[in-house]
Amino acid sequence: MPDFPDFDVIVIGGGHAGCEAAAASARFGARTALITHKRSTIGEMSCNPAIGGLGKGHLVREIDALDGVMGRLADKAGIQFRMLNRSKGPAVWGPRSQIDRKLYREAMQSELADYPNLTIIEDGAEDLIVEDGLIRGVVGLTGQRYGASKVVITTGTFLKGEIHIGAKRIPAGRIGEAPALGLSDRLYSIGLPMGRLKTGTPARLDGRTIHWDRLEMQPADEQPIPFSFLNSEITVRQVQCGITWTTPETHAIIEAHMNESAVYSGAISGRGPRYCPSIEDKVNRFGDRDRHQVFLEPEGLDDHTVYPNGISTSLPEEVQEKFIRTIPGLEDAVILQHAYAIEYDYVDPRALSPALEVKLMPGLYLAGQINGTTGYEEAGAQGLMAGLNAARAASGKDPVIFDRAEAYIGVLIDDLVTRGVTEPYRMFTSRAEYRLALRADNADQRLTQRGIDAGVVCETRAAMFHVKHRALESARNLLKTLNLSPAAAVRNGWAVNQDGRIRSAWEYLSYKEICFDHLAQVWPELSAIPAEIVAQIEIEALYSAYLDRQAEDVAALRRDEALSIPSDLDYDLIGGLSNEVRQKLKSVRPGTLGQAGRIEGVTPGALTALLGHVRRVRKAG
């Protein structure tokens, strides 16, 4: 066997979490290895051919702001860009794109192949090397030992993964690929709290056999907006998606065979994603509906495969054939790959610190579906943070942790390590208390400087960020120096309160009825401001009054987060706690008073008792 030098960080798994983890670690400067079964599956999109969406698009922008790879590669491979939620406020707009699977996979493999400080190793991970309770590396399927002081596990659905199609059970991490067994056993042996979750994927159809002329078609946006702050336009050819619906006949077939579904037959014990239910779940839970929407999503520009989003199932193949052909437009559809459900092991993320490090084993980090999440974007965000924090720890530096007022990444990780999961977790804008500030449009202004300070942002992005930051500051300052009386505003056709108070152009821009073009008619010098800067300034001004009020809430959050709790605190010594609250605090071991307050069931009275005890301990110490 070839000898490998010791690495600073080893990342196990070449999916979306693993790719971001390996890239972030390498960008920081750590000697990094990515261990994956096959180079050819790095960057594979195992389920839907899409990136972004409501909440998820915010995560992609944040990954990009920290110089991650997902957004840039999605721009290279995106074949139908759409901004979701346009009818609502900009804070909840969700960038999304259909993705050409082949283009994305090839772009990811090309990106990582020449990444400085990164070595790709084609092998499986059978076990961890542990000495004196500390991580020392990884043992491959070949028996090869790879040394490292930090290891990031990003195994997706591979931990004891098992595919279900009707009564069939197939050990697999995904279709056609073996599961990871030894690694799962090792995690159990560490004493980590673990469980089973499930997810599913629909059949893949031959687009040449679909009656597209019978369907409603959904085009891309006329002016696609890129994910990456480094890109100003999309050059990939855009395509349309089809929309169809299930029928009462579809539902009748599914109901007649419900007991043959792996989920309803009892073959699967793990819970599936609430917000991405199988078609059996939809029929069972929403019996009053006579149809459910199905999006027919092309998987590539030169690929005839179509992904029917909305009909994932674990029913037998012959039942799938029957019910699919009752859907308008799919009467003659040929199935290229049947749908399946997959059940897999996960670790209760409350076993992790906010740095995504395993509390019981320093040096071991987890990211992605192993932590109970679902989705490429959630995986990528965790991967970036786990990889960065592993690399920083390897060089003796403190972890980077975002709070809930800084980033959706902060919301995601705090939810996981504080509240845990009982079903696959996905991001929504509604999970963020400070979503008016955590917008997709300003992710770079929120996070890129933090990334620069953390050592994870390249010089090119840093330079572009500083140019944009200065342009925004200049535009804001100019708008705040230009003033107009209410009487003059009315003469320009603006409906404003005639209170005699002179207002700045910035204040006028906060009125919904007044846009930047209106201001430029009064102050022609504003026309010189670039369109990109104008777009963000308009959004900032619109929310300015709300953001000023929200600043008090953020300050309160930061005060609570500043009150740290010793990691070895003996909760049995705290009076006034119920047994339930005491057990929850022991399980999570919150690092701050703020985190303790977000644990389900922890009351204000319990927080007061906890705070008093911590202060007494500090005073005595």
Curated annotation (Swiss-Prot):
Keyword Translocase recorded: no
Q: Does the keyword Flavoprotein apply?
A: yes
Q: Which cofactor does it need?
A: FAD
A molecular function GO annotation: flavin adenine dinucleotide binding
Q: Which GO terms describe its cellular component?
A: cytosol
Q: Which family does the UniProt entry place this protein in? A: Belongs to the MnmG family.
* NCBIfam families listed in its UniProt record: mnmG_gidA (TIGR00136)
Name-wise, this protein is: tRNA uridine 5-carboxymethylaminomethyl modification enzyme MnmG
Native species: Hyphomonas neptunium (strain ATCC 15444)
